[in-house]
Amino acid sequence: MSSYSRITGTGSYLPPRRVTNDDLAKELATRGIETSDQWIVERTGIHARHFAAPEVTSSDLALEAARHALEAAGRKAEDIDLIIVATSTPDMVFPSSAAILQNKLGVAGCPAFDVQAVCSGFVYALTVADAMIRTGTARCALVVGAEVFSRILDFNDRTTCVLFGDGAGAVVLEASEEPGILASDLHADGKHVGILCVPGHVSGGNVLGTPLLHMDGQAVFKLAVRVLEDAARATLAKAGKTEADIDWLIPHQANIRIMEGTAKKLKLPREKLIVTVNEHGNTSAASIPLALDEAVRSGKVKKGETVMLEGVGGGFTWGAVLLNL
């Protein structure tokens, strides 16, 4: 039995429709909501995001990202013996988007389930897949983050609707004799539920509450920078590493100020920070694998380098994974 797991392929997918800040400002103006490219960029670092067509689901985006990851790993769908999808925007209440993705891949039999930790979801899912491989439950896992967050945005709230986008990212994680996933550190604190949530739910066929995203931006910012530093340091300690061992930091792509603040806390130069939030916006559980895939395919992040992944999201949830690519 192999003692470790390692990422052997990455993939991602963005819906074709790219929405710039100017595009969004024009759309919001028809609702009487004022914003601008300058206002958005200064506060978030976001210039554009992608929105899926109304008929496109999270599993549709996941399928494209999965195909790219499988190709990069030199694997076929039939080789996969575990599928985990991290999403907060599933196709249905049930079954899981992972089960739907499994069917779209044309395979059956292996375990398939969703993980819901919002923007920390991919870090959670990767940690679960690593544990299952280490215990021999799986040998070749497909781990996906996929979201259609545009469906749950309040376009009358300029402080939130400008932040998010749709997309998917995926990795193939395989059993390995050499260390890949070095350590992880996961946390949640339910007393912060109200600062980032979608408080509505369905009961008796009716929507109760508000089925749109609510966020206290200042509270999220203050908490995020602190807990991300703590998780990163805990993960390094578990792996017997220091900040100097990190070649690249790939945080959840939420807001450039949070990302730069975290890098500064870890004494990492800006050059070691992977940034895609400028073009993708916040894609929740998809943001980390999207950024990882873009960094790998551009040649920036290379095989053998040490990468810190960090996620923080509603719940409040947060965590980190340190890996050798």
Swiss-Prot record:
Signal peptide location: none
Enzyme class, UniProt record, top EC level: transferase
Keyword Zinc: no
Active site: 119, 252, 282
Location(s) in or outside the cell: Cytoplasm
Single GO biological process annotation from the record: secondary metabolite biosynthetic process
Pathways per UniProt: Lipid metabolism; fatty acid biosynthesis
GO molecular function: 3-oxoacyl-[acyl-carrier-protein] synthase activity; beta-ketoacyl-acyl-carrier-protein synthase III activity
UniProt keyword DNA damage, yes or no: no
GO CC annotations on file: cytoplasm
Alphabetical UniProt keywords: Acyltransferase, Cytoplasm, Fatty acid biosynthesis, Fatty acid metabolism, Lipid biosynthesis, Lipid metabolism, Multifunctional enzyme, Transferase
EC number: 2.3.1.180
Main location: cytoplasm
Reactions catalysed, as given in the entry: malonyl-[ACP] + acetyl-CoA + H(+) = 3-oxobutanoyl-[ACP] + CO2 + CoA
Membrane spanning residue stretches: none
Annotated segments matching region ACP-binding: 253-257
PANTHER family tied to this protein: 3-OXOACYL-[ACYL-CARRIER-PROTEIN] SYNTHASE 3, BETA-KETOACYL-[ACYL-CARRIER-PROTEIN] SYNTHASE III
Domain remark from Swiss-Prot or TrEMBL: The last Arg residue of the ACP-binding site is essential for the weak association between ACP/AcpP and FabH.
Subunit structure and binding partners: Homodimer.
Family: Belongs to the thiolase-like superfamily. FabH family.
Function recorded in the entry: Catalyzes the condensation reaction of fatty acid synthesis by the addition to an acyl acceptor of two carbons from malonyl-ACP. Catalyzes the first condensation reaction which initiates fatty acid synthesis and may therefore play a role in governing the total rate of fatty acid production. Possesses both acetoacetyl-ACP synthase and acetyl transacylase activities. Its substrate specificity determines the biosynthesis of branched-chain and/or straight-chain of fatty acids.
Protein name: Beta-ketoacyl-[acyl-carrier-protein] synthase III
Species of the source: Variovorax paradoxus (strain S110)
Originating gene: fabH
